[in-house]
Swiss-Prot record:
This is Probable GTP-binding protein EngB. NCBIfam families: GTPase_YsxC (TIGR03598). The keyword Magnesium applies. Belongs to the TRAFAC class TrmE-Era-EngA-EngB-Septin-like GTPase superfamily. EngB GTPase family. Mg(2+) binds at residues 38, 60. The lineage of its organism: Bacteria, Pseudomonadati, Pseudomonadota, Betaproteobacteria, Burkholderiales. GTP binds at residues 31-38, 58-62, 82-85, 149-152, 185-190.
Length: 227
């Protein structure tokens, strides 16, 4: 069983000064308010109510931390970080300013952050705000993995087109950098449970979870007799 299934709520942060003073790796989840971010986190962790999904898009304007650790372990081995959804028009100007500052400062300056899972609706990838998030994060030199959510809403050919175009945009970003990080993408559907294992492997690798390490094959050489 994936250690992600053991994820538990840890804390909510509304100011950078309140970020946990920890040293373990973190994986952040970002996306527009209607991209299915909370639902995807819940299904990756095989839980129904881990990440809260507000009935009003854009309502959640703080950062939620979830620990990843074996049962009864004294300390976490990593954190999943649910960032505020962005792009909802009805959020007030002052709240939006604070919220965007919190987002940009966290993704640009958090040294514990190992990678960014960026969720985009497969029907509308790379909106202006999605591009802004990528451009905030790229200078860190850390990887981005795009989940094209709600893939069940598209035909097979439209999904293939969306994935191809997304990978091209990522390749264009990489071409502008001297030493680009890994910029990858996949199709994802919480409803159809599509792409879950692929996304779990990415997150587990970034958190250096034991499940991400290849199994060590036993030696075929018999033990040398002692004495």
């Amino acid at each position: 069983m994936s250690l992600l299934h053991q994820a538990r709520f840890f804390t909510t942060v509304n100011h950078l000064r309140d970020l946990p003073a920890t040293a373990v790796p973190e994986v952040a989840f970002a996306g527009r308010s209607n991209a299915g971010k909370s639902t995807a986190i819940n299904i990756l962790c095989n839980q129904k109510r881990l990440a809260f999904s507000s009935r009003t898009p854009g309502r959640t304007q703080h950062i939620n931390f979830f620990t990843v650790a074996p049962v009864k372990a004294p300390d976490p081995v990593g954190f999943l970080v649910d960032l505020p959804g962005y792009g909802y028009a009805e959020v007030s100007g002052s709240a939006k300013f604070h919220w965007q500052g919190l987002l940009s400062d966290y993704v640009q300056a958090r040294t514990q952050l190992s990678g960014l899972i960026l969720m985009m609706d497969a029907r509308r990838p790379f909106t202006d705000l999605d591009c802004q998030m990528v451009e905030w994060f790229l200078p860190t030199g850390k990887p981005i993995h795009v989940l094209l959510t709600k893939a069940d809403k598209l035909t097979t050919s439209d999904n293939a087109k969306a994935l191809r175009e997304t990978r091209k945009v990522l390749a264009d970003y990489a071409a502008q950098m001297e030493n680009p990080p890994a910029l990858t993408a996949q199709l994802f559907s919480s409803l159809k449970r599509r792409g879950i294992e692929e996304a779990q492997r990415v997150v587990a690798g970034w958190l250096a979870l034991p499940e991400a390490q290849p199994a060590v094959a036993k030696s075929d050489t018999p033990d040398t007799p002692q004495g």
